[in-house]
Structure formats: C-alpha cells, structure tokens
A protein has these predicted regions:
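Short loop->beta-strand "edge-of-pocket" segments that line small-molecule binding or catalytic clefts
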Residues: 1-8, 93-107, 199-206
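A bilobed periplasmic-binding-protein/Venus flytrap-type ligand-binding module shared by bacterial periplasmic
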Residues: 16-18, 80-90, 178-193
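Short, polar/charged alpha-helical segment
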Residues: 4-37, 61-63, 111
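A ligand-binding cleft/hinge motif common to bilobed small-molecule-binding domains
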Residues: 51-64, 114, 147-165, 259-260
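A local structural motif
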Residues: 20-32, 46, 118-132, 145-146, ...
Length: 283
C-alpha cells in the first residue's frame, strides 16, 4: 500500500519513522510537500491514502473526485491559531476587516479564518488572504508585510515564544481541527481495510504517546527537522494521537465545514462531502 506522507501530518510522519508501523500492509511511504497536494496524488494513483486537515478532502469533493474518509484523529485544539503583532491594534477577530492575512489557503487555515470572522459578523471577502507558500511568515508578520498569520504546529510553538507576537484566536475554541485520513472512491478501499488502517493509526498513535521521548528523538533526527527533541516533545505532549474510524459524526463535521466555506464564497457551488470507507458506504 502506498501511503502519502507530508511534513504537516504528524500521524503519518511518525508512522513512517516508527518501527513496524503498517507492517501488515506492505507499506511504501511516499513523501510529498504539503496536504493540498493529496487529492492530485490520489487522482494519479501515486498514493492510496493520505492524511490532511479537514479542508483538502472537501476541496477534492468540490472537484468531483469523491473523497472517502477512512479515519480521524481526536480534535487538535492546540494545533492552530491566528497570530498578530504585540503592538498591533488588532485585539479581536472583528478588527481583521480589511487586513492582510497570511495562511495556507485551501487548508484548515481557511476554515479557521472563516469561522473566526463569522463569529465577528465578517466573511472571507472582508479580508485579504495572502498565500504563505514557502515564505518566512513569522518574519512577514513581525516586519509588517502582513497583519495576521494563520499557522500550526510546530511553527506555532516557536512563534509563541517570540516577544513581538500575540495570540488572537486558538483553533480549539473555533473548529474541531482533526487530522483526517482519506482516499478516493476509485481506489476501492474495502470497509474491513479501512477499519484495519484506522486501528493501525490508533495503535501507532498510542505507542507514540507511551514513549514521547523516543518519538521526539525520531522527529528531531529527520533531515530538515523543524525542531530539536525538546521542542518536538512539547508538541507531542499537546496532542491526543488516538485515531478512530470515520463515522457519521465526522461526516457531519465535514458537511458543516463545506457549508460554511460555501457561505463565505470559497466554493462557487454547494459541496456534498464524501462517504466513509470504514462503514462501507455513503452518508
């Protein structure tokens, strides 16, 4: 089985490093740059499933690709946030109107921003979205090229130690922010296989939580790692790495997000979210 791995999905990144992970699946871990590339790789057959935040599978459904949900992590309340400069006049989401906001657009960042704005009576059209790409977004924020920055672990933890940065919104109070593991209907992953994938993700996640120092050392030793073992241990201790098979509650969360993003004009047409592989059928 070809399993997609990108730097921002900690579960699969750890699975690639963890001894014996997915052994029964004869795994080939396929590295790629970021979660928004997942649908294209699934479409080409380069991977059989991947893990992302909540938005990429909805983007896939918007393109008519028929996303199929396999599993979901626990909510990740500490994994994402909107940051501003300490000297900024921005004190609440209502103050973001007309401001330049750096984010990975089309990821869960877009949903976090939309829900935060909605709570203040604003919409995505009321702000200027700046694609962060490969730029140094922390520097862009500190030096005033953007007014706010939507970010996630492990960059978030580093940014929060910066003396010039303030936390505006933490995603835990705004969206579930789960890690989702999904495929496309064309790959025909059977219900039993989906259940087995979910169980293995959960097993690895619980093994990591039982030996955080080992997992942190593995992450720190990766080429181009974003932090040392101590900083990775801090990230891991903030996470519940347990995983469950995708069920109706997950599909309902995804549909709520799809409707929110449509309401904000991110999608031009309504999107019906995908089915669950682990239950062997549709909604």
């Amino acid at each position: 089985m070809k399993i997609g791995v990108h730097p921002n999905n900690l579960h699969l990144r750890l699975a690639r490093l963890w001894p014996g992970a997915f052994e029964e699946f004869d795994p080939e871990f396929v590295g790629y740059r970021e979660g928004r590339d997942t649908a294209a790789l699934l479409e080409k057959g380069d991977i059989h499933f991947g893990g992302t935040g909540s938005t990429p599978p909805i983007e896939a459904d918007a393109r008519g690709l028929s996303a199929v949900y396999i599993a979901a992590s626990a909510p990740r309340p500490a994994n994402g946030a909107i940051l501003v400069r300490r000297d900024s006049p921005i004190r609440s989401a209502a103050d973001l109107s007309g401001k330049r906001i750096s984010l990975i657009d089309g990821s869960f960042h877009t949903y976090l921003l939309a829900r935060s704005l909605e709570g203040a009576g604003l919409g995505l059209a009321d702000v200027i979205r700046i694609e962060s790409g490969d730029s140094d977004s922390l520097r862009d924020l500190v030096e005033g090229r953007v007014d706010a920055w939507v970010t996630m672990s492990p960059r978030l933890e580093k940014a929060l130690t910066h003396e010039e940065i303030n936390l505006l919104v933490r995603c835990g109070s705004t969206i579930p922010n789960r890690s989702l593991f999904w495929t496309l209907a064309r790959h025909n992953i059977a219900g039993e296989t989906g259940q087995a994938i979910a169980a293995e993700l959960d097993r690895v996640g619980r093994a990591v939580m039982a030996d955080i120092d080992k997992a942190a050392a593995l992450l720190a030793a990766e080429t181009g790692s974003e932090g040392d073992a101590q900083s990775w241990a801090k990230v891991l201790r903030s996470r519940d790495l347990s995983v469950v098979a995708a069920a109706e509650n997950i599909l309902a969360e995804q549909q709520e997000e799809a409707e929110t993003l449509y309401r904000h004009g991110h999608f031009s047409l309504p999107v019906l979210t995908g089915q669950s592989a682990s239950t062997g059928g549709g909604r």
